[in-house]
């Protein structure tokens, strides 16, 4: 390890916890991770620091493996749920079994991913629990939806060559329902990282959440993989008129011709080129009703969600709950900051990850 102080180093934020940031440097000291704080001037101008941010680090001390983030470079992309920057593609992970593939749930994840405008890849894990006929059927089915899936088995270590090629030299966000094997997938792609693995629970066939914070992992092919906290059902919070463009099947139909009306909802309007016999049309109609209901609810609140927050239950039912009033807190004392620093300065990145599992 180099015991020196350098200035103007650049790197990527790979983890955020409390008021500290793990930065993976991309300079001559490749592979070094520094535990950094954020400069006070960044706080004053309201500059947040997110996982995935490209940052400039000052006062790097490789003896203590510490530094200070002095600048956050412009972001190419930004996702708020989970909070991560500069993602280039989303890898949606599902399971062929345990839990079983649910077309409606897959559609929700696909629509949510499409709304980001990022490239989308689909991975189906646990193919060792199914039959070859199932794999073929789902391959054709997802292709009909506009996606080319990668079929893998973490248990049997199968199918990873093509998947790694897809992840090569990209920053990828991993997402999908809980219990499909995302943590096991990361363990297989990056053996030196030991992610907690949760079993699939009982009758509901839903996985237990094993990831609590967004983290970036370095892949052997120079890509970066962001593991997001598992969740069972993403929300549909787009505008009704935007939903059409989040289905590749609809985009393909509109590329061949236009509907008679510019504001066509593709339900009962005459001369509609979208309405018809395509598999996910019913999913589109259900999500459209959800988007319309959400928009109407927002219009009824004069403050546009300023005092209410939207909650979506597992059945897709929307409810609004009052937001907690904002509170003013005292500025953290210097002594408290020093105590936090002492607790973190001797920790490795793996130690911080292990804290999440407690």
From Swiss-Prot:
Cofactor: Zn(2+)
Keyword terms of this UniProt record: Cytoplasm, GTP-binding, Hydrolase, Metal-binding, Nucleotide-binding, Ribosome biogenesis, RNA-binding, rRNA-binding, Zinc
Skewed-composition ranges (Basic and acidic residues): 337-348
Cofactor binding note from Swiss-Prot or TrEMBL: Binds 1 zinc ion per subunit.
GO biological process: ribosomal small subunit biogenesis
Location in or out of the cell: Cytoplasm
InterPro entries: G_CP_dom (IPR030378), NA-bd_OB-fold (IPR012340), P-loop_NTPase (IPR027417), Ribosome_biogen_GTPase_RsgA (IPR004881), RsgA_GTPase_dom (IPR010914)
Basic residues bias spans: 325-336
Enzyme class: hydrolase
EC number: 3.6.1.-
Binding site for Zn(2+): 259, 264, 266, 272
Pfam families given in the database record: RsgA_GTPase
UniProt cross-references to SUPFAM superfamilies, sorted A to Z: Nucleic acid-binding proteins (SSF50249), P-loop containing nucleoside triphosphate hydrolases (SSF52540)
Residue ranges of every copy of the CP-type G domain listed in the record: 76-234
GO CC terms, sorted: cytoplasm
Self-association and partners: Monomer. Associates with 30S ribosomal subunit, binds 16S rRNA.
Role this protein plays: One of several proteins that assist in the late maturation steps of the functional core of the 30S ribosomal subunit. Helps release RbfA from mature subunits. May play a role in the assembly of ribosomal proteins into the subunit. Circularly permuted GTPase that catalyzes slow GTP hydrolysis, GTPase activity is stimulated by the 30S ribosomal subunit.
Designated name of the protein: Small ribosomal subunit biogenesis GTPase RsgA
Species this chain originates from: Microcystis aeruginosa (strain NIES-843 / IAM M-2473)
